[in-house]
Swiss-Prot record:
Gene3D superfamilies: 3.30.190.20, 3.40.50.790. This is Large ribosomal subunit protein uL1. GO terms for molecular function: rRNA binding; structural constituent of ribosome; tRNA binding. One of its GO terms (cellular component) is large ribosomal subunit. Signal peptide: none annotated. It comes from Mycolicibacterium paratuberculosis (strain ATCC BAA-968 / K-10).
Length: 235
Protein backbone atom coordinates (compact mmCIF):
# COMPACT_ATOMS: atom_id res chain seq x y z
CA UNK A 1 0.00 0.00 0.00
CA UNK A 2 1.18 3.51 -0.73
CA UNK A 3 1.72 6.06 2.00
CA UNK A 4 -1.12 8.07 0.53
CA UNK A 5 -3.61 5.22 0.89
CA UNK A 6 -2.50 4.64 4.48
CA UNK A 7 -2.98 8.32 5.23
CA UNK A 8 -6.41 8.20 3.65
CA UNK A 9 -7.44 5.15 5.69
CA UNK A 10 -6.25 6.82 8.88
CA UNK A 11 -8.23 9.92 8.00
CA UNK A 12 -11.32 7.89 7.11
CA UNK A 13 -11.26 6.21 10.53
CA UNK A 14 -11.91 9.61 12.11
CA UNK A 15 -15.23 9.90 10.26
CA UNK A 16 -18.33 8.25 11.75
CA UNK A 17 -20.25 7.18 8.65
CA UNK A 18 -23.41 6.68 10.69
CA UNK A 19 -23.37 10.24 12.02
CA UNK A 20 -24.69 13.37 10.34
CA UNK A 21 -22.40 16.26 11.22
CA UNK A 22 -23.28 19.92 11.50
CA UNK A 23 -21.64 22.21 8.92
CA UNK A 24 -19.19 23.48 11.53
CA UNK A 25 -18.30 19.97 12.72
CA UNK A 26 -17.84 18.85 9.11
CA UNK A 27 -15.60 21.82 8.33
CA UNK A 28 -13.42 21.10 11.35
CA UNK A 29 -13.20 17.40 10.49
CA UNK A 30 -12.38 18.15 6.84
CA UNK A 31 -9.39 20.17 8.01
CA UNK A 32 -8.27 17.32 10.28
CA UNK A 33 -8.67 14.62 7.61
CA UNK A 34 -6.91 16.34 4.73
CA UNK A 35 -4.47 13.65 3.56
CA UNK A 36 -2.03 15.96 1.79
CA UNK A 37 0.63 18.36 3.00
CA UNK A 38 -0.54 20.92 0.46
CA UNK A 39 -3.34 23.38 1.19
CA UNK A 40 -6.16 21.17 -0.06
CA UNK A 41 -9.40 22.48 -1.51
CA UNK A 42 -12.55 21.87 0.55
CA UNK A 43 -15.47 20.72 -1.57
CA UNK A 44 -19.18 20.03 -1.13
CA UNK A 45 -21.14 17.35 -2.99
CA UNK A 46 -24.94 17.32 -2.87
CA UNK A 47 -27.38 14.74 -4.23
CA UNK A 48 -30.58 16.57 -5.14
CA UNK A 49 -34.10 15.23 -5.43
CA UNK A 50 -34.57 16.51 -8.97
CA UNK A 51 -34.71 15.05 -12.47
CA UNK A 52 -32.14 17.09 -14.43
CA UNK A 53 -33.47 15.65 -17.70
CA UNK A 54 -36.49 17.92 -17.25
CA UNK A 55 -35.97 21.61 -18.00
CA UNK A 56 -38.18 22.70 -15.11
CA UNK A 57 -35.99 20.83 -12.61
CA UNK A 58 -32.62 22.26 -13.62
CA UNK A 59 -30.71 23.79 -10.70
CA UNK A 60 -28.11 26.33 -11.71
CA UNK A 61 -26.85 29.41 -9.95
CA UNK A 62 -24.11 31.54 -8.51
CA UNK A 63 -23.18 32.75 -5.05
CA UNK A 64 -20.59 35.10 -3.63
CA UNK A 65 -18.80 33.23 -0.84
CA UNK A 66 -18.27 35.62 2.10
CA UNK A 67 -14.71 34.38 2.62
CA UNK A 68 -13.84 33.61 -1.00
CA UNK A 69 -12.50 30.31 -2.31
CA UNK A 70 -8.84 30.74 -1.39
CA UNK A 71 -7.95 30.87 -5.06
CA UNK A 72 -7.81 33.90 -7.33
CA UNK A 73 -9.61 32.85 -10.48
CA UNK A 74 -8.20 33.60 -13.92
CA UNK A 75 -10.87 35.42 -15.90
CA UNK A 76 -11.24 35.77 -19.67
CA UNK A 77 -13.50 38.49 -21.07
CA UNK A 78 -14.97 38.76 -24.56
CA UNK A 79 -15.37 42.48 -25.18
CA UNK A 80 -14.20 45.33 -27.39
CA UNK A 81 -13.62 49.05 -27.07
CA UNK A 82 -14.56 50.75 -23.83
CA UNK A 83 -15.90 47.52 -22.31
CA UNK A 84 -12.58 45.79 -22.98
CA UNK A 85 -10.77 48.64 -21.24
CA UNK A 86 -13.13 48.37 -18.25
CA UNK A 87 -12.51 44.62 -18.02
CA UNK A 88 -8.75 45.12 -18.05
CA UNK A 89 -8.98 47.83 -15.40
CA UNK A 90 -11.04 45.48 -13.21
CA UNK A 91 -8.30 42.84 -13.33
CA UNK A 92 -9.33 40.49 -16.15
CA UNK A 93 -6.46 38.18 -17.09
CA UNK A 94 -7.15 38.10 -20.81
CA UNK A 95 -9.47 40.28 -22.89
CA UNK A 96 -10.31 39.98 -26.58
CA UNK A 97 -12.85 39.18 -29.25
CA UNK A 98 -12.09 37.37 -32.51
CA UNK A 99 -8.45 37.09 -31.49
CA UNK A 100 -9.36 35.41 -28.19
CA UNK A 101 -11.81 33.09 -29.92
CA UNK A 102 -9.11 32.01 -32.38
CA UNK A 103 -6.71 31.44 -29.51
CA UNK A 104 -9.24 29.20 -27.74
CA UNK A 105 -9.93 27.31 -30.99
CA UNK A 106 -6.19 26.67 -31.04
CA UNK A 107 -6.30 25.02 -27.62
CA UNK A 108 -5.88 27.90 -25.16
CA UNK A 109 -7.94 27.31 -22.01
CA UNK A 110 -5.80 28.88 -19.29
CA UNK A 111 -8.68 30.52 -17.41
CA UNK A 112 -11.25 29.54 -14.79
CA UNK A 113 -14.21 31.69 -15.87
CA UNK A 114 -15.37 33.56 -18.95
CA UNK A 115 -17.45 36.72 -19.27
CA UNK A 116 -18.92 38.29 -22.40
CA UNK A 117 -20.77 41.45 -23.29
CA UNK A 118 -24.13 40.69 -24.98
CA UNK A 119 -22.91 41.89 -28.39
CA UNK A 120 -20.12 39.29 -28.33
CA UNK A 121 -22.30 36.22 -27.76
CA UNK A 122 -22.95 35.52 -31.45
CA UNK A 123 -19.20 35.17 -31.91
CA UNK A 124 -18.65 33.27 -28.65
CA UNK A 125 -21.26 30.77 -29.84
CA UNK A 126 -18.66 29.48 -32.29
CA UNK A 127 -16.71 27.97 -29.39
CA UNK A 128 -19.70 26.80 -27.33
CA UNK A 129 -18.68 23.16 -27.85
CA UNK A 130 -15.30 23.95 -26.34
CA UNK A 131 -16.44 26.11 -23.43
CA UNK A 132 -19.76 24.42 -22.59
CA UNK A 133 -18.54 20.99 -21.44
CA UNK A 134 -15.94 22.71 -19.24
CA UNK A 135 -18.48 24.97 -17.55
CA UNK A 136 -16.86 28.04 -19.10
CA UNK A 137 -19.61 29.22 -21.46
CA UNK A 138 -20.86 32.71 -20.53
CA UNK A 139 -24.52 32.67 -19.52
CA UNK A 140 -26.96 35.44 -18.52
CA UNK A 141 -28.30 33.26 -15.69
CA UNK A 142 -24.91 33.24 -13.97
CA UNK A 143 -24.22 36.91 -14.59
CA UNK A 144 -21.43 36.20 -17.05
CA UNK A 145 -23.21 37.72 -20.04
CA UNK A 146 -23.47 41.35 -19.02
CA UNK A 147 -22.64 44.89 -20.11
CA UNK A 148 -21.17 45.50 -16.64
CA UNK A 149 -18.00 43.51 -17.21
CA UNK A 150 -16.09 45.31 -14.45
CA UNK A 151 -18.55 44.13 -11.77
CA UNK A 152 -18.59 40.60 -13.19
CA UNK A 153 -14.79 40.41 -13.09
CA UNK A 154 -14.71 41.80 -9.54
CA UNK A 155 -17.36 39.30 -8.38
CA UNK A 156 -15.47 36.30 -9.75
CA UNK A 157 -12.12 37.52 -8.47
CA UNK A 158 -13.74 38.10 -5.08
CA UNK A 159 -14.99 34.54 -4.61
CA UNK A 160 -18.10 34.11 -6.73
CA UNK A 161 -18.75 30.47 -7.62
CA UNK A 162 -21.05 28.87 -10.17
CA UNK A 163 -22.82 25.55 -9.72
CA UNK A 164 -25.00 23.38 -11.93
CA UNK A 165 -26.67 20.04 -11.34
CA UNK A 166 -25.17 17.24 -13.43
CA UNK A 167 -26.90 14.36 -15.20
CA UNK A 168 -26.85 12.27 -12.02
CA UNK A 169 -28.58 15.06 -10.02
CA UNK A 170 -25.37 15.96 -8.18
CA UNK A 171 -24.03 19.42 -7.37
CA UNK A 172 -20.34 20.07 -6.70
CA UNK A 173 -18.76 23.30 -5.53
CA UNK A 174 -15.78 24.64 -3.57
CA UNK A 175 -16.12 26.39 -0.20
CA UNK A 176 -12.48 27.20 0.51
CA UNK A 177 -9.14 25.73 1.52
CA UNK A 178 -8.08 23.49 4.40
CA UNK A 179 -6.11 26.44 5.78
CA UNK A 180 -9.36 28.37 6.34
CA UNK A 181 -10.75 28.67 9.84
CA UNK A 182 -13.60 26.18 10.27
CA UNK A 183 -16.05 29.00 10.95
CA UNK A 184 -15.16 30.64 7.63
CA UNK A 185 -15.69 27.32 5.85
CA UNK A 186 -19.04 26.86 7.59
CA UNK A 187 -20.13 30.38 6.66
CA UNK A 188 -19.20 29.78 3.02
CA UNK A 189 -21.12 26.50 3.18
CA UNK A 190 -24.15 28.25 4.64
CA UNK A 191 -24.14 30.95 1.97
CA UNK A 192 -23.98 28.35 -0.81
CA UNK A 193 -26.65 26.12 0.73
CA UNK A 194 -29.01 29.05 1.17
CA UNK A 195 -28.77 29.73 -2.56
CA UNK A 196 -29.25 26.07 -3.47
CA UNK A 197 -32.38 26.00 -1.32
CA UNK A 198 -33.65 29.24 -2.83
CA UNK A 199 -33.35 27.68 -6.29
CA UNK A 200 -35.43 24.60 -5.47
CA UNK A 201 -37.61 23.93 -8.53
CA UNK A 202 -41.35 23.99 -7.84
CA UNK A 203 -41.60 20.79 -9.91
CA UNK A 204 -39.26 18.97 -7.52
CA UNK A 205 -41.30 16.63 -5.32
CA UNK A 206 -40.25 14.86 -2.15
CA UNK A 207 -36.94 15.37 -0.42
CA UNK A 208 -34.83 18.06 -2.12
CA UNK A 209 -31.50 17.71 -0.28
CA UNK A 210 -31.00 13.94 -0.30
CA UNK A 211 -27.35 13.69 0.69
CA UNK A 212 -24.54 16.13 1.45
CA UNK A 213 -20.86 15.41 1.98
CA UNK A 214 -17.94 17.71 2.69
CA UNK A 215 -14.35 16.69 1.96
CA UNK A 216 -10.96 17.94 0.94
CA UNK A 217 -9.74 17.03 -2.53
CA UNK A 218 -7.93 13.92 -1.26
CA UNK A 219 -9.78 13.33 2.01
CA UNK A 220 -12.76 11.14 2.94
CA UNK A 221 -16.34 12.31 2.54
CA UNK A 222 -17.97 13.64 5.71
CA UNK A 223 -21.78 13.27 5.84
CA UNK A 224 -23.58 16.50 6.74
CA UNK A 225 -27.09 16.89 8.15
CA UNK A 226 -29.13 18.31 5.21
CA UNK A 227 -31.57 19.97 7.62
CA UNK A 228 -28.89 22.37 8.90
CA UNK A 229 -27.50 25.09 6.65
CA UNK A 230 -26.08 27.38 9.30
CA UNK A 231 -24.55 26.30 12.59
CA UNK A 232 -21.62 28.51 13.44
CA UNK A 233 -21.77 28.73 17.23
CA UNK A 234 -21.22 25.08 18.05
CA UNK A 235 -17.66 24.14 18.98
Amino acid sequence: MSKRSKAYRAAAEKVDRDNLYTPLQAAKLAKETSSTKQDATVEVAIRLGVDPRKADQMVRGTVNLPHGTGKTARVAVFAVGEKAEQAQAAGADIVGSDDLIEKIQGGFLDFDAAIATPDQMAKVGRIARVLGPRGLMPNPKTGTVTPDVAKAVADIKGGKINFRVDKQANLHFVIGKASFDEKALAENYGAALDEVLRLKPSASKGRYLKKITVSTTTGPGIPVDPSITRNFAEA
